[in-house]
Amino acid sequence: MLKLRKAPASYDERFMDTMASEYLDRTPWTELRLEAVRDLLDPQPGDRIVDLGCAAGAITHYLSTYGAEPVGVDLEPLAISRARELFQGLRFEVADATRLPFEDASFDKAVAADFVEHIEDDTFVAMCDELRRVLVKGGLFAIYAPNPRHLIERMKERDFVLAQNPTHIGLRDADHMRRVLEQGGFEVVRSEWRPSFFRGLRSVEKVAGPKLELFRYRVCVLAQAR
């Protein structure tokens, strides 16, 4: 039987602790995210990277292990407080992704891992406009997000066995993601999908995923600022 993390309606202290422990313990769910972010963003020493919706700071810290210079941002003060406690020496800021407290061209790259599904299209476009300001010309933006067409998400949508995360108000497939990014001034340079971490299902996804979107667990997109 599938067992999924059940996110609360709001991100409380327990949720932040869970996010942190999953990263520190390197759970299969975490490894899947880290692998996707690494492959998409290709972090290099000296890369200035803004991590949007950083939560407890897992991705921010992971990028720092490659010698990058990441900054994590999140609108939730509790998230930033916990990130600062866990990963001292790294920079974390309480900030709205549509109004970032950084100067123009402050970053080479940006990442949003399991974040854009929490915002609606108009906010997404506003965020892209802001990212184009804080990124250098031609800067890269990597996205890792749930695929609403995947079997698990369809089950959640129908409230069949699994319940939908109430904070997932902006689930998008790859085509929808591309349209919003283009509207926000980005050009998609790479688009792919990733299988899940559930052993039995993952085997099926690897075989069927190339042909059927029902078995594409995550949408992975790399876009470049125009």
Regions found by a protein language model. Give the residues of each.
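Short catalytic micro-motifs in class I SAM-dependent methyltransferases
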Residues: 114-118
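Conserved N-terminal segment of class I S-adenosyl-L-methionine
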Residues: 1-103, 109-113, 125-128, 170, ...
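S-adenosyl-L-methionine-dependent methyltransferase catalytic module, highlighting the catalytic core
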Residues: 2-3, 7, 11-15, 19-31, ...
